């Protein structure tokens, strides 16, 4: 799948004029071969499976020529569809937060890194937690989410060491 901008760029790069490119895009849209909203939903599912944050997904879609508003709306629709597919429409945790929020996903990634580090018998020192933070930042999580996750992971680690 491609976005309208990507198709226009490809056609212009290969010698088609502005008018021909617009006609081709209009025809592709008419036959439903080209749909930026559907593209956003599919890209959201792909990017979430990779652990990316919503903000990063919106930026990546904007780079592909999708308006940020369309991207956010499509992401919200895709999230609702995913909840319905899982039979969790309206599901929320104790605090009323959606179960698919960025903090929960970031926490899963951090916990996985801690678990792998523990299984490999390696120390979980400040250097390690800095690496977790960089990983989360690379996935596009905001600093508040990262600090919150790191604080919880550090506290869990202190509690674990105190128990042993």
Sequence positions of predicted segments:
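An alpha-helical, amphipathic repeat domain used for nucleic-acid recognition
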Residues: 1-164
């Amino acid at each position: 799948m491609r976005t309208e901008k990507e198709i226009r760029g490809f056609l212009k790069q290969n010698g088609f004029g502005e008018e021909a490119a617009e006609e081709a895009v209009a025809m592709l849209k008419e036959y439903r071969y080209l749909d930026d909203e559907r593209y956003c939903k599919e890209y959201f599912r792909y990017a979430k499976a990779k652990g990316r944050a919503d903000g990063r997904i919106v930026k990546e879609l904007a780079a592909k020529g999708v308006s940020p508003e369309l991207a956010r709306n499509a992401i919200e629709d895709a999230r609702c569809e995913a909840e319905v597919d899982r039979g969790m429409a309206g599901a929320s945790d104790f605090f009323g937060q959606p179960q698919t929020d960025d903090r929960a996903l970031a926490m899963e990634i951090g916990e996985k890194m801690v678990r792998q580090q523990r299984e490999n018998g390696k120390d979980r020192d400040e250097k390690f937690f800095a690496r977790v933070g960089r990983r989360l930042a690379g996935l596009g999580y905001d600093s508040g989410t990262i600090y919150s996750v790191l604080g919880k992971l550090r506290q869990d680690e202190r509690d674990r060491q105190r128990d042993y």
